Amino acid sequence: MAKNKNAVINRTLHTVADLHVREAGEGEPQRRTITGYAILFNTPSAPLYDYRDEMAVEIIAPAAITREFLDGCDIKMTMFHDRQLILARSKNGAGTLKYDVDEKGVSFEFDAPNTVDGDKALELVRRGDISG
């Protein structure tokens, strides 16, 4: 059976680093901004495959992802990797999910929505239960 060389492959990244809530200063209203890194360059991922003596990890090179590439994508920040629990989104570079590409990787920032899921995300990040 021949493989379709034009097939689209969807990838889901499950590693987040430096995740935190940007706290408000004294006298400022409480903030709902969550920031972190979705991708760290030149850093081994969690094992994608680990069986017996064989293990595979992924290392993403800085040249693999550009701002221009991301600006053409539909990117969703989800709760627990559940595509129904969307916290923020960037569609073709516009939306509630902000991101940047720097020497460390791909950083992100979004204001958690005023929903049950947004409140849950804020609390879990503040407590350190979700930390990357």
Regions found by a protein language model. Give the residues of each.
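Signature of dsDNA virion morphogenesis modules
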Residues: 1-132
